[in-house]
Amino acid sequence: MEPPKRISFFDGRLLTAEDLTAEQDYFLGRLRRHNRLLHGYGVVQGLHVSVTGNTTAPSVTVVPGYAVDPLGHEICVCSAIVLPVPQKGTSLHVVICYRECPTDLVPVPSDPAEPDSEMKPSRIADTFELLLSATWPQRRADPCGEVTGGASGVPLARLLFSRRRWQVDRRFRVPRAH
């Protein structure tokens, strides 16, 4: 593993998009290592799951909250989310995963005589995806802080189908960041 490198600035240096991206990558990597190695992964606050709806249209509701995924990404949920669930099954995990979403398209400078300039995103939004998974892999970290095995996400609950309806499994231990 190579030690992290940050940009060295000096007067007269020409900065490129690659340099600015490297600067962002350095600080994001540092923040994510900090989150992963000092706090672990899991729910920090909120993100409680409840089963709502009836037997013909069941759904789960996740309340606002904050989590850190196994890679150190911060996941912020600002408003309640409702996700439909199948009418029957055996068990499901409710999992939240970090996602980056390119946004705010702007034209790319090109030939002024060219009427249709290419558009590229000027921002990247830190968002998330809420998933239902029949199986959820266990995660483990090696001594160097690398995460191995399975998809990156935070399981918020396990749902069990019992007596013709979904219920939150109270025995399931939600991982907690500290």
Regions found by a protein language model. Name each.
Residues M1-F9, S59-H178:
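Beta-strand-rich solenoidal segments
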Residues E2-T61:
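N-terminal "first-domain core" detector
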